[in-house]
């Protein structure tokens, strides 16, 4: 059988080993050191909005710290986009808080501003005002930033911007990862750049970054001995892994262009085909890195048939994220919406999108698509 075509596999740029070797040569193996500092500066320079970045062990850790920094505690309610990966919602439970899930809108597949406001009004009247909003740029597609911000500001609720999938995307020329009161990034192995495993917290002030780093290094107080006046976490990024990130940052823009080219391959392929929709930017204000290219088919049955046809040729594809309000672990929590995310999940499929896919890989994908849609 031919080699596997992955949905989104790591793509090294060439200089990752140089930074890793420097870490070994200088014995900076711990979760601190020149690569960590350099990686944070590289991201800050790239985002270019006067932000401060704390490199962490995962995007999940970054969301957890964001909730702590915003004062989320037991029994607080936190609004969360339902159509996302579970890592967006799990940290709410870590804090013994209560998630309130909100549906997507049909253009970007991200949080619906109308459903968001409905949720805020309902919870404020029946319980208490939610303490934070976690909103996601799904598959690299920016959410409706202005509309979501308008609702959040109207009710004075801070936004945690989950930009785990959207490094390299932008809205009205501003980089994703800079729109939240606190924002997060992910560098998991399947992301547009990787540190093997890793993430980052992005803030607007140096003081908040320093607080995040303090919490991420077991909240050790300034003392000659180990002194702790609050609970901390082991969430800092390894200097070795940060070296991978420094090499990856050098090729980020190239990776974005390659993924956008792969997305255009699918747009062109399906452009004259009825019943198949490719996720695309709704206007020139939106610029997606197209981390994953996703389509919506006519039915669940057709979606599954295509997935299995690709699988039979050793080509990975994957259904869209199953909404959190449909997950067994979250079914007891409130949901506000009209079924958009459920419909997308039932009919949607992510197709191979990696920046390292070859012409031969594209041809193999095309052959399967041709046979399926003939």
Region locations from a protein language model:
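Short beta-strand->loop structural element characteristic of the AMP-binding/adenylate-forming
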Residues: 81, 98-108, 318
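Conserved coil-to-alpha-helix start sites within the AMP-binding
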Residues: 84-89
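Active-site phosphate-binding strand-loop segment of PLP-dependent enzymes
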Residues: 107-195, 200-202, 207
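Phosphate-binding glycine-rich loop
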Residues: 32-77, 91-94, 101, 125, ...
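Short, conserved catalytic or interaction motifs in soluble domains
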Residues: 58, 104, 189, 217, ...
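A short hydrophobic/small-residue beta-strand
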Residues: 78-79, 92, 99, 159, ...
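PLP-dependent aminotransferase class I/II
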Residues: 34-41, 49-54, 114, 118, ...
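N-terminal "arm"/small-domain region of PLP-dependent enzymes with the aminotransferase-like
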Residues: 1-30, 352
């Amino acid at each position: 059988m031919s080699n596997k075509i992955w949905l989104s596999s790591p793509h090294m740029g060439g200089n990752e080993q140089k930074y890793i070797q420097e870490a070994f040569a200088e014995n900076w193996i711990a979760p601190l050191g020149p690569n960590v500092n350099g990686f944070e500066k590289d991201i800050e320079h790239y985002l270019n909005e006067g932000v401060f970045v704390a490199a962490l062990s995962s995007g999940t850790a970054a969301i957890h710290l964001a909730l702590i920094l915003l004062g989320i505690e037991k029994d607080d309610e936190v609004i969360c986009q339902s159509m996302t990966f579970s890592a967006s919602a799990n940290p709410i439970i870590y804090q013994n808080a209560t998630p309130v899930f909100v549906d997507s809108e049909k253009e970007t597949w991200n949080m619906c501003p109308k459903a968001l406001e409905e949720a805020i009004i309902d919870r404020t009247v029946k319980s208490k005002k939610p303490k934070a909003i976690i909103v996601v740029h799904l598959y690299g597609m920016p959410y409706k930033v202005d509309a979501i911000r308008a609702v959040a500001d109207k009710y004075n609720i801070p936004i945690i911007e989950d930009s785990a999938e959207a490094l390299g995307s932008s809205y009205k020329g501003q980089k994703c990862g800079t729109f939240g009161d606190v924002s997060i990034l992910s560098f998991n192995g399947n992301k547009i750049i990787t540190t093997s495993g890793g993430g980052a917290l992005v803030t607007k002030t140096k003081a908040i970054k320093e607080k995040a780093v303090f919490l991420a290094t077991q909240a050790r107080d300034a003392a000659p001995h180990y002194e702790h006046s609050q609970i901390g976490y082991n969430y800092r990024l390894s200097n070795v892994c940060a070296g991978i990130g420094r090499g990856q940052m050098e090729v980020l823009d190239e990776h974005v262009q390659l993924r956008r080219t792969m997305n255009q391959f699918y747009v062109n392929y399906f452009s004259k085909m009825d019943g198949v929709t490719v996720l695309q930017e709704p206007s020139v204000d939106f610029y997606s890195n197209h981390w994953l290219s996703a389509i919506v088919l006519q039915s669940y049955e057709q979606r599954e048939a295509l997935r299995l046809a690709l699988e039979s040729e050793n080509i990975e594809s994957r259904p869209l994220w199953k909404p959190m309000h449909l997950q067994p672990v979250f079914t007891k929590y409130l949901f506000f919406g009209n079924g958009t995310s459920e419909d997308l999940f039932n009919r949607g499929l992510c197709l191979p999108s990696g920046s390292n896919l070859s012409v031969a890989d594209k041809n193999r994908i095309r052959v399967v698509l041709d046979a399926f849609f003939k």
